[in-house]
Every structure is written in C-alpha cells, then in structure tokens.
Swiss-Prot record:
Organism: Trichoplusia ni
Residues annotated as signal peptide: 1-20
Alphabetical keyword list: Antimicrobial, Bacteriolytic enzyme, Disulfide bond, Glycosidase, Hydrolase, Signal
Cysteines joined through disulfide linkages: C27-C141, C48-C131, C83-C97, C93-C111
EC number of this enzyme: 3.2.1.17
Classification via InterPro entries: Glyco_hydro_22, Glyco_hydro_22_CS, Lysozyme-like_dom_sf
Pfam hit, one: Lys
SUPFAM superfamilies for the chain: Lysozyme-like
C-type lysozyme domain: residues covered: 21-141
Enzyme class: hydrolase
Record family assignment: Belongs to the glycosyl hydrolase 22 family.
Protein name per its UniProtKB record: Lysozyme
Reaction catalyzed: Hydrolysis of (1->4)-beta-linkages between N-acetylmuramic acid and N-acetyl-D-glucosamine residues in a peptidoglycan and between N-acetyl-D-glucosamine residues in chitodextrins
Active site: E53, D71
Length: 141
C-alpha cells in the first residue's frame, strides 16, 4: 500500500510539472505545424481544424461522445480507434491518450497525419462543420 501511495504521489508531481500548450495565435500554431512537417498546401485546413476542435489548446479533453468514447488534445484524437486510455500505448496510433494532451505535439501530430492519410479531413467534425469553404487567412505567417 505504501508503494502505491508513493507511486501516486510521484505521478501527481509529474503531472503538475507537465503544462499544456495553448497557441495564442494562428501564426504561432502555423510555425509549430511547419516544425512538425505538416504540408503547406493543407496548412489552412489544419489550422481551421485545430481552432474548431480544441481551440488551439493541447490539454483539451472532449466530453464523452454518444458511443462512450472521448477526444483528446490539440487534434481531438479519439480513444475508440486511435489512442489507449490505459498507461500502455496502443490502438492504431500506438500511443496513450495522455500523450495527446502534452505540450510536445510530436506524437499527436504523427497520429493526426495517420488519421488524415486514412480518412482525410472528413474524420473531424470540427473541420466538416466549420472549415469546408471557410479557411483562415494565414498569409502573414
């Protein structure tokens, strides 16, 4: 029991030290997406998707969906297919959902690209409902 208590305290301390990232502007987000290797020709789509899915906040956890699943992080990656709710990486992206909430978006970006490769932007309701034909101007970024 004592070992469990120590482990939980260490885990809590680790979580406190992990801060989520909020991208204050579209340009700040664009610079990070470029760093992550997102293609320029789809950049406006990615920015719009992220604005509408997570509000540019890596720590965003969606409400529980009708099917019992939940969406996580900047790209709102779903735990039914893509990330594992346990501490063991799994599902199609071989990551934990907790990793989707980190300020380092490397794993979340890789997973989002995998989702896009399979389903394009249609995989995200935020893009479907708000971005088709209405993309942000990022020309000054």
């Amino acid at each position: 029991m004592q070992k469990l208590r120590v482990f939980l305290l260490a885990l809590a301390a680790l979580c406190i030290s992990c801060e989520a990232k909020y991208f204050a502007t579209n340009c700040e987000l664009v610079h990070e997406l470029r760093r992550q290797g997102f293609p320029e020709d789809k950049m406006r789509d990615w920015v719009c998707l992220i604005q509408n899915e997570s509000g540019r906040n890596t720590s965003k956890m969606g409400t529980i969906n009708k099917n019992g699943s939940r969406d996580y992080g900047l790209f709102q990656i779903n735990d039914k297919y893509w990330c594992s709710k346990t501490s063991t990486p799994g599902k199609d992206c071989n990551v934990t959902c907790a990793e989707m909430l980190l300020d380092d978006i490397t794993k979340a970006s890789k997973c989002a690209k995998k989702i896009y490769k399979r389903h394009k932007f249609q995989a995200w309701y935020g893009w479907r409902n708000h971005c088709q034909g209405t993309l942000p101007d990022i020309s000054k970024c």
